[in-house]
Amino acid sequence: EEKKKNSIRPLLASEIECRVGTMKPDGSGCSLLLYKDARVDMRILDEVFGEMNWKRHHDVVNGNLFCTLSIWDNEKKEWVSKQDVGTESSTEKEKGQASDAFKRAGFNWGIGRELYTGPFIWIPLEKNEVYQSKTGSPALYTKFSVKEIGYNEQKEIILLVIVDNKNRVRFAYGNTKEKVYAPNVSASNASGKVYTGVDLDRAIKQMTGVKSREELERVWAEHP
């Protein structure tokens, strides 16, 4: 069973979802996070272990919903289990929490763990891509998806291309010839300066190159 666990493949581009992580208050840019759908976990479990050789069980502990994901070990003739807790969904509370717990338990088995090795993803946005939500914060019309992804032997992400729903490349990482679409933006700072040409390119490169929240806040301060 250990060999089977090690044979769990990295996720395909079509199996990965892009969701907004953070967005600048003025809507001029956002970060993206890579996610997997619970159906991906089920598909890979069926592929690697077989439909009859895994099972899931949910328990409520201190008000939290846990998922126990068990795999049948044919050599030991016993079930081997890994568990994790889910977080609530903003829409369907119980269903979302159960799905999240299942996906987290799948992470513990190695399904989609490579998503944690990805680069920080920053997307500059155009004004017509953003609208004001009911809460008053900026929200996106544009949807993003993974066009291409590549891994090394350690199952770490070494190539990543993200496109929008108009099939324009909005982010590229690694050894790729894809040309990233340059949004028609003009970012003004407090003194009224407008970033264009070389200055705009430099600002965008700084945004797309950050790798931590602290670095992101520093770049935001430089290009408010």
Segments from the language model and where they lie:
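Interfaces that engage single-stranded nucleic acids at replication/repair/recombination sites
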Residues: 1-30, 123-224
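OB-fold ssDNA-binding interfaces and closely related basic DNA-contact patches used
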Residues: 1-6, 13, 28-53
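Short histidine-centered catalytic/ligand-binding loop motif
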Residues: 22-34, 85-92
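Positively charged, aromatic-enriched nucleic acid-contacting surfaces
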Residues: 40-183
